[in-house]
A protein has these predicted regions:
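N-terminal periplasmic/intermembrane-space "pro-region" immediately following the signal or transit peptide
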Residues: 1-73, 79-92, 337-341
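Signature for the C-terminal beta-barrel architecture of outer-membrane proteins
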Residues: 23-36, 59, 132-149, 168-357, ...
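Surface-exposed loop and membrane-interface regions of Gram-negative outer-membrane beta-barrel proteins
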Residues: 58-78, 85-147, 164-173, 224-226, ...
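Substrate-binding cleft and catalytic face of glycoside hydrolase catalytic domains
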Residues: 94-106, 148-156, 161-162, 197-202, ...
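Surface-exposed extracellular loop regions of Gram-negative outer-membrane beta-barrel proteins
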Residues: 155-167, 345-368
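Flexible glycine-rich, low-complexity coil/linker segments exposed to the extracellular/periplasmic environment
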Residues: 354-391
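C-terminal structured "cap/appendage" subdomains that terminate the fold
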Residues: 439-464
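Outer-membrane beta-barrel "beta-signal"
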Residues: 445-447, 482-494
């Protein structure tokens, strides 16, 4: 049975599960049931094609040969997931299992040498207990109107980005496996002081490997957090933080203040004679995010953060700084589609000597922001390996339009520079700080949307998107060939 046939059978099984798992509403006597059960599934099918992606042949721990990074890639990804939830009173228990296997149309390698070959592994993706709107006299005495909490394995990425609203800081707990999973093992509490003020308190732990899994031997011990592809799977990360959110000036000035700590544990890099022991690293990020809305048409986003930290083998300095400024304008032309222009610049500090022995590492540490922030393509290796957004200045002009539910479009383009010349982009350690011009466009569209409060097969939804990227490398890199990325995707939800 080939991969496509298997995916169709998986899809059918997911649909059957959804059909028999309708949400409980009322009992036959008309009284509300004290326990509500619901379940469902989703299936994601996508194909990704890319070529000519420049690497970092300049040496150090980020070395990658140009030919390895420029290699043509064509992969199909199949991700089935199934979930259930049980709710009673204010409490809810939610669980989800997932799998993702891949097919490589252009590969001649034996099946077992291909990553994520079928059936790969079924793993525990989410398992948490939560509650919302809890009230008590002792909370009121402390000035807290209500409390929410969520405890267990959960995603930090929600439908609108980071669950904390910090899309450059806290988003992804398992970056190495891409969008297969996003989870962290986390405890989170939200204190609501009134309708305009809240405080999020959280602590999390991300293991470098997932031991709650069932699958092929090739998937066992897969690294989930590695920075470089030669990192061992014992690269564990943990930390926590405080995020204070308030809406001031009658809703015209939402802002956030945050303090977030992260520790990356010791791990090994390479193997055999080339094995290197990497010391633990601790970083605390202090920042502010302002999102003023001047008029109905004009808005802005300003974020600034400073990191303080150390590499723990000798208290060497670690951590950098970040700034983001974005101006938005929604034109009245075609107003029903909310056409919005934005001009944004993002700055992540760099360290020109970070690859030298016994040196500091004062480049920006992306914390848990290691995901596809501005590019689907560049995270595959052009940015210090896996999603390591650092040492970068990127200015882009963007147009966004929204036509309806799950129906929208965006396009953006702009130049990208290295904040400092770290000589990683060229084998001769020469070149400039100009990394190139990155452009992208994406179109999302619905195929079938479910009506509100639909049950059974009526709640089946199908939606899709296509996205393309073009990167024209600058003198920072050895390569001058334009790199491209294309993806189509269809999602089925039950």
């Amino acid at each position: 049975m080939n991969t496509v046939e298997t995916s169709i059978l998986t899809l059918a099984a997911c649909a059957a599960l959804a059909a028999v798992a309708e949400p409980a509403d009322e009992t036959a006597t008309g009284r509300e049931s004290p326990v509500r059960f619901d379940a469902g599934a989703d299936f994601r099918l996508r194909q990704e094609i890319m070529d000519n992606l420049p690497g970092l042949p300049g040496g150090g721990p980020y070395a990658m040969t140009t030919t390895e990074r420029a290699k043509y890639r064509n992969q199909m990804r199949f991700r089935p997931r199934a979930w259930f939830e049980v709710e009673t009173g204010p409490l809810r228990l939610y669980a989800r299992i997932a799998d993702e296997f891949r097919y490589f149309p252009a590969s001649n390698d034996p099946k077992k040498k291909r990553p994520y070959y079928f059936p790969d592994e079924v793993f525990l993706d989410n398992l948490y207990l939560d509650a919302q709107g809890l009230e008590s006299p002792w909370l009121s005495a402390a000035g807290v109107e209500s409390l929410d909490f969520r405890l267990g394995r959960q995603d930090m990425l929600g439908p609108n980005g980071s669950i904390f609203g910090l899309n450059r800081i806290v988003v992804e707990g398992t970056p190495t496996d891409g969008s297969r999973s996003f989870y962290s093992d986390m405890a989170r509490t939200t204190l609501h002081f009134d309708e305009t003020k809240q405080l999020d308190v959280f602590a999390l732990y991300d293991s470098g490997r997932n031991d709650i899994r069932w699958g092929t031997s090739g998937s066992r011990g897969r690294s989930l957090n590695c920075i470089n592809m030669t990192d061992s799977n014992d690269l564990d990360e943990w930390g926590g933080g405080l995020v204070y959110s308030q809406t001031a000036l009658e809703g015209h000035l939402p802002f956030k203040l945050y303090s977030i700590f992260k520790r990356t544990e010791a791990h090994t890099k390479g193997s055999g004679a080339n094995e290197i022991r990497v010391s633990p690293k601790e970083v605390t990020t202090l920042g502010v995010l302002l999102q003023p809305q001047f008029t109905e048409n004009w808005g802005m986003e300003v974020e600034a953060a400073k990191q303080v930290g150390r590499i723990c083998d000798g208290n060497r300095e670690a951590g950098g700084h970040m700034a983001h400024v974005e101006l938005r304008y929604m034109t009245d032309f075609l107003r029903a589609y909310k056409p919005t222009f934005s001009l944004a610049t993002t700055y992540y500090s760099g360290d020109r000597h970070r690859t030298e022995p016994d040196d500091t590492d004062t480049a920006w540490d992306p914390m848990w922001g290691r995901y596809t922030q501005d590019s689907e393509m560049l995270v595959y290796g052009t940015l210090y390996e896996n999603c390591w957004w650092s040492n970068m200045i990127y200015t882009k002009l963007k147009l966004t339009m929204k036509f309806g539910p799950r129906h929208g479009f965006y396009v953006y383009s702009g130049p990208m520079f290295a904040a400092v010349q770290d000589h990683l982009g060229r084998a001769d350690h020469d070149g400039s700080t100009f990394k190139g011009v990155l452009s992208a466009a994406r179109y999302d569209f619905p195929i079938r949307l479910a009506p509100k409060k639909a049950t059974g097969f009526d709640r089946v939804e199908v939606f899709a998107h296509v996205v393309g990227e073009l990167f024209n490398p600058g003198d920072y890199y050895d390569s001058s060939k334009p790199a491209y990325f294309f993806r189509w995707q269809v999602d089925f939800r039950f």
